[in-house]
């Protein structure tokens, strides 16, 4: 395979990763709803350690455990933010109108 073939493969893998991350986010939203209804905390460090351990144990390389840990810490940070917004909705939804839109209407 040449470099363009490898790049096509990476593009395909990136699309699959994005789909899986969105699927994970949907599951996180459902868990966030359950947490809200049962008054469970958003941040559960034991569960996050368990997730990282599971990923590291299932990995067959070439990523080092440290690298996987960093990747998953970031993923879980983003997912925690999604849960936070699910459990504690924004009290003042942002308007889609911009300052420029307001000036154009004047």
Q: How would you name each of these model-derived features?
A:
Residues 1-106:
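Domain-level signature for soluble enzymes in the chorismate/prephenate branch of the shikimate pathway
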């Amino acid at each position: 395979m040449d470099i363009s073939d490898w790049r096509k493969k990476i593009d395909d893998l990136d699309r699959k990763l994005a789909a899986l991350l969105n699927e994970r986010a949907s599951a996180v939203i459902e868990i966030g709803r359950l947490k809200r209804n049962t008054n469970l905390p958003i941040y559960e460090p034991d569960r996050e350690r368990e997730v990282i351990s599971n990923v590291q144990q299932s990995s067959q390389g070439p990523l080092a455990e440290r690298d996987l840990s960093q990747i998953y810490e970031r993923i879980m940070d983003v997912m925690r933010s999604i849960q936070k917004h699910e459990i504690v909705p924004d009290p003042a939804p942002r308007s889609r109108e911009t300052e420029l839109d307001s000036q154009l209407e004047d």
